[in-house]
Regions:
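Short beta-strand/loop motif that positions the catalytic acidic residue
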Residues: 171, 177-179
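Acidic catalytic loop of the alpha/beta-hydrolase fold
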Residues: 182-186
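Conserved alpha/beta-hydrolase catalytic His-Asp/Glu region
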Residues: 95-97, 113-169
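Catalytic histidine-centered segment of alpha/beta-hydrolase-like enzymes
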Residues: 210-223
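Flexible "cap/lid" loop of the alpha/beta hydrolase fold
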Residues: 72-76, 80-111
């Protein structure tokens, strides 16, 4: 939530919009029962419950990567959203995706998030963002496996329950699809084209100078596009 509480949030508020950023169960400062499986159903149910308890109206759900899938599943469960913003979310369920996802969990099991980030960054980030990250990366002393019952590991393990065979054509709300071209892991252009073209009401934004983490790489530009999307829906 750090980026949202910084430049992104400030820009949204300047334009008259509000925002709510929250941590999933298992993420920093978010309590959880370590006997629970932090699977897709639980994370989506938490999102729905949060929106209902806070009585949020006139909302746009925004999700990065699998977060976009969770947001879409919340809409499928009946959450009233004016629109969806999917950031490097669209992908097909196949052997390649399952291999990547399971390998990421295994890497985190043995080397923690530090090794996982060092392994992924060159193939998900833009060269300029990679340079910014380099000073705090590539330090083997940071490679410490995650405890089985730690929040982050349980979240990663739970993410393997996600069903990527969702019928995207059933989405009835306007969708903004953001894609970073330096994402060499999840960006399969033909698949994104096919899925996007199946949607009833979709806009697309291509970030040729970004990778997977668009909100971190270009926070102001990202917020400007969110404001524009929200304005067009009002």
């Amino acid at each position: 939530t750090t980026a949202w509480n910084g430049e992104i949030g400030k820009k949204l508020i300047e334009d008259g919009n509000g925002f709510l950023a929250y941590n999933f169960r298992g993420q920093d400062k978010s309590k959880f029962d370590d006997k629970l499986n932090l699977d897709t159903d639980l994370i989506v149910s938490d999102l729905c419950l949060l929106i209902e308890k806070l009585k949020l109206n006139n909302i746009i759900l925004v999700g990065l990567s699998i977060g976009g899938l969770y947001a879409t599943l919340a809409v499928e469960k009946g959450i009233k959203s004016q629109g969806l913003v999917l950031i490097n979310t669209l992908r097909k369920n196949n052997t390649r995706l399952k291999w990547i996802n399971e390998t990421m969990v295994n890497v985190a099991r043995y080397g923690g998030t530090a090794l996982l980030m060092d392994m992924n960054m060159p193939v998900i980030a833009s060269p300029s963002f990679l340079e910014k990250m380099k000073s705090n990366a590539l330090n083997p002393s940071n490679y410490k496996g995650l405890e089985k019952n730690s929040g982050i590991f349980k979240l990663m393990e739970g993410s393997l329950t996600a069903n990527w065979d969702i019928d995207w054509s059933k989405i009835d709300v306007p969708v903004l699809v953001m894609t970073g071209h330096h994402d060499k892991v999840f960006r399969i252009s033909d698949d994104i084209d096919e899925i996007s073209n199946s949607m009833k009401n979709v806009q697309r934004l291509e970030f040729s100078d970004c990778g997977h983490l668009i909100p971190l790489e270009k926070p102001i530009e990202f917020a400007v596009h969110l404001n524009k999307f929200a304005k067009n829906l009002s």
